[in-house]
């Protein structure tokens, strides 16, 4: 007879305790513990839908044909996955409510239906509701199946009947296994349902997409084990009041985690943005103070983005600092360098900084653009609309080299920029395209003197 053991599990982080706790000692969440009964039982060996048991094989004998990636019609989506969908992969997609996760997967699944059988399982919407949303996306292939169900046993039965090539679960928090105690979305339910989906995906080469809810802190809800079990973790980011969405990989066993895909939400669904640099800069005002352009790298893709700054005298006892899309600590460091090394009196100035377009900038190469934007607003002097800035700022005010400098300069030249300020030590041996001047600089003070003299 199976032994039953009661444990209390934190719904936020998955921490387990033998007794109820008002506050989680791991994540400090209040009233997050729920009681769950753990049933220990011996399960049979895992088999595929064809009834074949898995057995050890030599690495050199593994068939590489099964690794063939399936391309979707969205090049941005393929880029983030590393070149396409790998058979048997388990892909988790998280994002804020209403950001467009279901819309993205519905578009992707309709495209995959042209290359295989798709089973779309929804625990949040009825089949009629999904059909209503899908009508704006265009024609749907006959190999696209909808299934509104939350019972894992029933879902497994239909998987065995249909034998899909692609499976979409929307969402994992709504699916429950009747063999496991706990409500839908509980730690034990999410863990066991994900384990069963992983077994189905790996033994039958079913590419599986899972939608995951996020907490108010922006992390994926449920046990941390969920992210360890899957092959790929994607975050769909963006502000609900902006039309742009960014798909970012934070874990990918079949590709790079540095790639991003950029989409725009329109009435007909998500449309990929193939030239994000032009989109992010098209509304920039000529002659405005507090603005500077940087060429940032998102994976292997260079993107031109605008850094905006507003520096005003404070009316409070302490100066206020606010950032959106930029790292607060990095901005504070740059302001300290400007005050110490360049003589800008910023201790009594409020500073508000943001990256235009909602894109997040977090690499060291943006330092020089941030410094120039702050100085431009402080001095009330605009920068030239044809100038871009590259470089990391050290604590002594020096400009340090950044990666892929040649690729960044080429992107700036392609969009019509005529001058780029870049670290002098990084310019040796690179080919500079015609029509653009690259100014090698060594200190941030040298840049400010050249730009605002």
From Swiss-Prot:
Alphabetical UniProt keywords: ATP-binding, DNA damage, DNA repair, DNA-binding, Hydrolase, Metal-binding, Nucleotide-binding, Stress response, Zinc, Zinc-finger
SUPFAM superfamilies referenced in this protein's UniProt entry, alphabetically: P-loop containing nucleoside triphosphate hydrolases (SSF52540), Ribosomal protein S5 domain 2-like (SSF54211)
Chain ranges of zinc fingers (C4-type): 10-27
PROSITE patterns tied to this protein: RECA_2
GO cellular component: cytosol
Region (Lon-protease-like): 350-453
Listed GO MF terms: ATP binding; ATP hydrolysis activity; ATP-dependent DNA damage sensor activity; damaged DNA binding; zinc ion binding
EC number: 3.6.4.-
A GO biological-process term: recombinational repair
Cross-referenced InterPro entries: AAA+_ATPase, DNA_repair_RadA, P-loop_NTPase, RecA_ATP-bd, Ribosomal_Su5_D2-typ_SF, Ribsml_uS5_D2-typ_fold_subgr, Rubredoxin_2
Positions in coiled-coil regions: none
SMART domains per UniProt: AAA
Binding-site positions, ATP: 95-102
Motif (RadA KNRFG motif): 251-255
Domain notes: Has a putative N-terminal zinc-finger, a middle region with homology to RecA with ATPase motifs including the RadA KNRFG motif, while the C-terminus is homologous to Lon protease.
Similarity comment: Belongs to the RecA family. RadA subfamily.
Protein role: DNA-dependent ATPase involved in processing of recombination intermediates, plays a role in repairing DNA breaks. Stimulates the branch migration of RecA-mediated strand transfer reactions, allowing the 3' invading strand to extend heteroduplex DNA faster. Binds ssDNA in the presence of ADP but not other nucleotides, has ATPase activity that is stimulated by ssDNA and various branched DNA structures, but inhibited by SSB. Does not have RecA's homology-searching function.
The name this protein goes by in its record: DNA repair protein RadA
Organism whose genome encodes this protein: Streptococcus pyogenes serotype M1
Gene name in the database record: radA
